[in-house]
Amino acid sequence: MSFTYEYPRPALTVDCVVFGFDGGGLQVLLIRRALEPFLGSWALPGGFVDMDEDLDQAARRELEEETHLSRVFLEQLFTFGTPGRDPRGRV
């Protein structure tokens, strides 16, 4: 008996919000998007979750790939899932 079936499979993504202090003010780390969609726009570091990793691993990998930051305290704060958030498809 087969347990596979055709069903839409949304992509899973993570974004990281990194706070810092500069002088007396709170700062948020942003990157410039290197690819479409929104090439050159400011964005939070993040990306797609690989099939063999959990969300924490994906967040750490994406943060290091895009900012070269490692050994950073991470905590999941919110989850968003509104359809239409990304022009590439359902995330």
Model-predicted regions and their roles:
Residues 10-14, 57-60, 64-91:
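Active-site segment of metal-dependent pyrophosphate-handling enzymes
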Residues 34-37, 49, 79-82:
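Short active-site-proximal "capping" loops at secondary-structure junctions
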